[in-house]
Amino acid sequence: MKGFYMYYLGIILASVVGYFLGSISWSIIIVKKVGNIDIRTIGSGNPGATNTVRALGKKWGLVVAFLDALKVIFTSIIAILLSLIPSSLFSQTSYFIPCIFALIGHCFPIYYKFKGGKAVSCFLGLLFVVNILYLIIFLIVWFISVAISRKVSVASIFSAFFVLIIMWIPYLNGVSYFIWQWNGLEQFSVAWKNYILFSLLNSFHYWFSNIWASGMLEGNIIVLIGGLILGLRHSQNIKRIKNKTEPDTFPRKKQAIKN
């Protein structure tokens, strides 16, 4: 039992804090403050960035998306601070694992009877923490998809699925070959130097201790879990997409009929 706490106490503490941090619903707070509206009673009823756009416009939707992504990033920063504590209880605190609990908190917030958002903005924060290249690819695919489909749900689901596929491709994930080890810095020093160029926050492990960092496999598994949660949270959207009843988030402008 002592050995368990020796390696995982920092992860447990950061994960608990991350869950409570993730449970903060910025869409509920901001829409109520700015528009005096309960976002859960309008539009899709979902407390997220897209429904905030419906309630307050694109500007506030972007604000909510940014703040939701920050919940995951701040959770990683908390893990970083814990890892700096000069004790074996905290020195190997993962920066990735606690982030998934922030995403779970967003979807199932304790402050709002476990009824939360659909994880897209938090997934963006997760991609930023794990691998900045994943985030860039997601955003490129998302903007193209939303321009074609006019549906945020379609763009979000497709972009997440696309990232879940390409993240296993060498070089796109920052390494030249697959690294399976969690604590593999010594054995793969050259590959790690390439990997942490894309995993910015993970680089702190290397800079501060020079002996340990979260592995590529760990990061990809966390992204996979986040992507699956995102997909499950969009299950109703997927049904409507199949039935061709999913409404456009950004309807196309109707062309005037010339006589």
From Swiss-Prot:
<protein>
    <recommendedName>
        <fullName>Glycerol-3-phosphate acyltransferase</fullName>
        <ecNumber>2.3.1.275</ecNumber>
    </recommendedName>
</protein>
<feature type="transmembrane region" description="Helical">
    <location>
        <begin position="124"/>
        <end position="144"/>
    </location>
</feature>
<feature type="transmembrane region" description="Helical">
    <location>
        <begin position="11"/>
        <end position="31"/>
    </location>
</feature>
<keyword id="KW-1133">Transmembrane helix</keyword>
<keyword id="KW-0808">Transferase</keyword>
<dbReference type="GO" id="GO:0043772">
    <property type="term" value="F:acyl-phosphate glycerol-3-phosphate acyltransferase activity"/>
</dbReference>
<comment type="pathway">
    <text>Lipid metabolism; phospholipid metabolism.</text>
</comment>
<keyword id="KW-0812">Transmembrane</keyword>
<feature type="transmembrane region" description="Helical">
    <location>
        <begin position="188"/>
        <end position="208"/>
    </location>
</feature>
<dbReference type="GO" id="GO:0005886">
    <property type="term" value="C:plasma membrane"/>
</dbReference>
<keyword id="KW-0472">Membrane</keyword>
<keyword id="KW-0443">Lipid metabolism</keyword>
<feature type="transmembrane region" description="Helical">
    <location>
        <begin position="211"/>
        <end position="231"/>
    </location>
</feature>
<comment type="function">
    <text>Catalyzes the transfer of an acyl group from acyl-phosphate (acyl-PO(4)) to glycerol-3-phosphate (G3P) to form lysophosphatidic acid (LPA). This enzyme utilizes acyl-phosphate as fatty acyl donor, but not acyl-CoA or acyl-ACP.</text>
</comment>
<dbReference type="GO" id="GO:0008654">
    <property type="term" value="P:phospholipid biosynthetic process"/>
</dbReference>
<keyword id="KW-0444">Lipid biosynthesis</keyword>
<dbReference type="InterPro" id="IPR003811">
    <property type="entry name" value="G3P_acylTferase_PlsY"/>
</dbReference>
<keyword id="KW-1208">Phospholipid metabolism</keyword>
<keyword id="KW-1003">Cell membrane</keyword>
<feature type="transmembrane region" description="Helical">
    <location>
        <begin position="62"/>
        <end position="82"/>
    </location>
</feature>
<dbReference type="Pfam" id="PF02660">
    <property type="entry name" value="G3P_acyltransf"/>
</dbReference>
<comment type="similarity">
    <text>Belongs to the PlsY family.</text>
</comment>
<comment type="subunit">
    <text>Probably interacts with PlsX.</text>
</comment>
<feature type="transmembrane region" description="Helical">
    <location>
        <begin position="152"/>
        <end position="172"/>
    </location>
</feature>
<keyword id="KW-0594">Phospholipid biosynthesis</keyword>
<feature type="transmembrane region" description="Helical">
    <location>
        <begin position="93"/>
        <end position="112"/>
    </location>
</feature>
